[in-house]
Amino acid sequence: MSEVTNNPTHNRLLAKLRAMGPYLRDPQSKEGLYYFDCLSVCIDDRKSPELREFWGWWMELEATEGGFTANYHIGKYDVEGNWLDLAIPKNALEEVNKTQNCFHLKLVKTLEENFQLSVAYHEQSVEFV
């Protein structure tokens, strides 16, 4: 039986967040504030990989008393590697919502089972349907 702690160290938390998959962006993360993103839908897969842009989501996970708040955004990941807060076309929106929902469920489960910490949506977070 694994030990559950609700006061994890930064490194223990990072290890669990990394194990969730390729979402965590270490260089943009710091203790108490973690950055995630997902390139859900390629805009034009005929372009060479280094020139591709994507529709997707990004999120800042901020530590709070007893848990975290998740502030999700949706938009376009451009060729320069920047997220742009743009409306996603309907033909890509379903997949973006699906990847975000799957990730969020995994995040909530990971933090609850390992650390007894909750995750709430930030008041400015994009709603996924």
Curated annotation (Swiss-Prot):
The keyword Zinc-finger does not apply. It holds the Pfam family Crl. It is found in: Cytoplasm. It comes from the Bacteria. GO terms for biological process: positive regulation of DNA-templated transcription. Keywords: Activator, Cytoplasm, Transcription, Transcription regulation. One of its GO terms (cellular component) is cytoplasm. Residues 99-119 are annotated as: Essential for activity. InterPro entries: Tscrpt_reg_Crl, Tscrpt_reg_Crl_sf. Binds to the sigma-S subunit of RNA polymerase, activating expression of sigma-S-regulated genes. Stimulates RNA polymerase holoenzyme formation and may bind to several other sigma factors, such as sigma-70 and sigma-32. Belongs to the Crl family. HAMAP family: Crl. This is Sigma factor-binding protein Crl.
